[in-house]
Amino acid sequence: MIRIETFGEYNRVVLLGEKRNMFSQQLIERLSGVNCDKNLVITNEGPVFSAGLDLSVFLQSKDAVLEYLFGVHRLVKRFIGCGSRVVAYVSGDVYGFGVEFLYFVDYVVAQRENIRFSLQGVNFGVFPPYTIAIGRSLFSHGHLRVMLNREFNAEEALHFGIVSQIGQLEPEKLFKPPPYLLGLLSPRRWLGAVVDDAIPYLYMLAEVGTREETRDRIRKFLGRRREN
């Protein structure tokens, strides 16, 4: 599910591609246990950085969905509160909450321009709660119109501000401020003041996501994915 490697000043957390690195309950638990007192690089093996939320959860009870979504929210807050720098090195396509997760790290490097980013869950009724809640603080109106209507590539994501750089990860070229300044210099930390604005949308997502129409769309999507 994940592999942790140590190199230099960073620990590298490698998402191993199981179930397209969707944020299953197991992956959430493993990531929640990662020590982030040391600088982290989060990256992936395989063609997908993350497939986003575990859509199969929405076929369960509303209470189960809420429990799952608040587990996701606790993970987000944990990474916002990490004491050291968190960098994402994206070498595969990114979907749904996988895109939103990148809002909560310090620096994002996409390996190449043609990596795809998509908030495609809106097609099933599974809307992106963090984009809806705090997206207007992060992106322009024009960028949100693209993000919420079609997939986009890494070059566009760089223009929007989701991606910081396209190319190879070179952590040694990043600034190295003393630890006591990281809280002042990290936009990720600033999001701690607004991230709970997403909570009403988590409740709304649990309600919308368990409607029978939404579940029918999810079943069809999961069925097509299994066939492929």
Residue ranges of each PLM-predicted region?
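Terminal peptide-recognition signature
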Residues: 13, 31, 42, 54, ...
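Catalytic-core regions built around general acid/base machinery
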Residues: 30, 71-83
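Short, active-site-adjacent cap segments at secondary-structure transitions
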Residues: 47-51, 95-96, 116, 192
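Glycine- (often His-adjacent) and acidic-residue-rich active-site loop
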Residues: 44-75
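Conserved CoA-thioester-binding segment of acyl-CoA-metabolizing enzymes
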Residues: 1-45
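Crotonase-fold acyl-CoA enzyme core
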Residues: 78-83, 87-97, 101-181
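Short glycine/proline-enriched coil/turn segments at helix->beta-strand junctions
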Residues: 9-10, 34-40, 60-61, 82-84, ...
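C-terminal alpha-helix plus adjacent terminal tail
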Residues: 1-7, 17, 49, 153-154, ...
